[in-house]
Amino acid sequence: MTDSLDRRLVATLYADGRADVRSLAAETDTAATTVQDRLRALEDDGIITGYAARLGYDRLGYETAIFQLAVDHENIDAVTARLREKPAFVTVYETSGHHTVVAVGKFGDENAIGSCLQELHADAAVRAVDVVRVDVVSEADCPIAPE
């Protein structure tokens, strides 16, 4: 991000992804045309990659599970690509240490978690997999503080 205005725009959009240019302009005390230009630049630079609703998965009956996978480095790209294709996984990380891939998933029930676990155990590129069910305490908070 290039400056304070960009940070304020991103933080404001994170809090309300449905905010229109006029409300963003009012919130940041900036001309609407400037806000529109900045948003376009943030999109072009890949800083803003899209606009989406944040869901209360627990209210929809979903369970959150974290899958920790031990994958050899030469297989990481292929494994993370397969995980990204699965709608249940909302976040996939490449990490250092024993667990080289960590994926956070939202599952409709225990059976869905178990099926995914079995599939990953059968994947020849995955040396080991651990899964932990978690209760979400906080999710989707914006780490970018407006300046």
Regions found by a protein language model. Give the residues of each.
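A compositional/biophysical signature of low hydrophobicity enriched in polar/charged and small residues
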Residues: 1-147
